[in-house]
Amino acid sequence: NFDSVSLRERNISDEIYGMTSKRLPVTLDPTLCVDANTWDKIINRAWEKRRYIVLYHVMLRFSPIVHSILLNKVNQIAKFHGWDVVDLSIGNYSVNDFVSIIKYAQCVVTTSFHATVFSIIFSRPLFPVRLHDGNDARYVDLLNALNIGGVLKDLDFDDKVPPKIDYKCVHDALTKLREPSLDYLTSCLRPC
């Protein structure tokens, strides 16, 4: 028995509506409900002095060939700019290091919702790569909601310089998206 339910994905809300005729509200992922100042409290500044590009392919174990293609592209971009490569797809990183590595990256190449989120929060140059594998909806929807869906790349991209993103406009749009989510969550937590 629940008093309130919300979802983080519009496509799931649409599926539930199709089965039940009940429209469930879609709220932002909790990582987006706070701004960079909140995330800065857990930052590991040891990453600040390094110059590197980040790769994070969340589905590595299911698609090693895709990871290999992405890593090759990242290595080409790194060589072009004289950067090191940090591959978050391999190894175990704490939440602090994951967030910190993205915060201080010169550029992020990812197929991950959360790497996209933190790139946006910290205004990092970004290549979000759409694989058309059914796992792209969350970050594709987010980028479209922030009016930057045009930065999405397909796996065959060969750019060496990330697309320009007007992060002031992005953060303004994110603030507008954040308000109804926080209002809904606050209303759910009020005592009856």
Please tell me what each predicted stretch does.
Residues 1-192:
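Active-site anion-handling motifs in enzyme catalytic cores
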